[in-house]
Amino acid sequence: MKEIKIQNIIINEEKAPLVVPEIGINHNGSLELAKIMVDAAFSAGAKIIKHQTHIVEDEMSKAAKKVIPGNAKISIYEIMQKCALDYKDELALKEYTEKLGLVYLSTPFSRAGANRLEDMGVSAFKIGSGECNNYPLIKHIAAFKKPMIVSTGMNSIESIKPTVKILLDNEIPFVLMHTTNLYPTPHNLVRLNAMLELKKEFSCMVGLSDHTTDNLACLGAVALGACVLERHFTDSMDRSGPDIVCSMDTKALKELIMQSEQMAIMRGNNESKKAAKQEQVTIDFAFASVVSIKDIKKGEVLSMDNIWVKRPGLGGISAAEFENILGKKALRDIENDTQLSYEDFA
């Protein structure tokens, strides 16, 4: 799986990573605020906007009214009731996003949510970490035959395997996202090597869905080969909400887009470890050649007493060959401080 296309966006290992700003529930249920955040992301250079599609009664049982997330003071049920957009408002948000030329992406947290997004005509699905091992829901969404970006936080390789099998069986193009689901995530729990483990285990494109408070983890992920980066997004860090603390604002988003492009260039595309041809101008003066360090008479044996290695590297014998010519006899008189050539000895 070398490439995924979502409308006009191409994701592969050669291009700069796709940066996904997630508005999520940062709009607190306000369509107008959601539009303001879309505008802010657009102004920063975003190509895509991610939302969360919550249909609470299909997503959660009443037991969720007793579960309070670690980054909140009210139950997850109450949070989602407050923040969910209904069909009309979400469709309006999707249309607004697309009028700006941006791709609308969302995470469904239920079968009804997935059906809503399919009915709206989305081009791809984002799967949250909590749904990574929700195999019935994964199968349901896979039936739509759309590309999927799948977060894998809180899951092990073993629990991810059934999801990947579903995707492969349905021939779904996908990216696996390493994630740590702590809001915010301390740097010592980012564990970027886990992203490499996903790539090794599943031979797929990978990315990072990050919940730290800066862009550092994302940039590190790019250096390691991330094709997709995701962070929560807000137009202002002064907003209220459980995800604001780990969100990026317009300035941070603009920086992440620009710096991730630069990091991808610095990473390169699987080049082997060898000198770049452009380095020749430096090689010429930085490398060393074999030179005489005193006058040498014809017939004299070359030794460490009369030859050594010195810059520049423009001589006939490189420093790497020094030991191979020790013990050879000079075929001519050689003046001190002369760069040797193979014609000088036998």
Curated annotation (Swiss-Prot):
E.C. code: 2.5.1.56
Record's protein name? N-acetylneuraminate synthase
Q: Which organism is it from?
A: Campylobacter jejuni subsp. jejuni serotype O:6 (strain 81116 / NCTC 11828)
Q: What does this protein do?
A: Transferase involved in the biosynthesis of capsular polysaccharides. Catalyzes the condensation of N-acetyl-D-mannosamine (ManNAc) and phosphoenolpyruvate to generate N-acetylneuraminate (Neu5Ac).
Name its pathway.
Capsule biogenesis; capsule polysaccharide biosynthesis
Q: Where is the AFP-like domain?
A: 289-346
UniProt keyword annotations, A-Z:
Capsule biogenesis/degradation, Transferase
Any stretches that span the bilayer, and where are they?
none
- What reaction does this enzyme carry out catalytically? N-acetyl-D-mannosamine + phosphoenolpyruvate + H2O = N-acetylneuraminate + phosphate
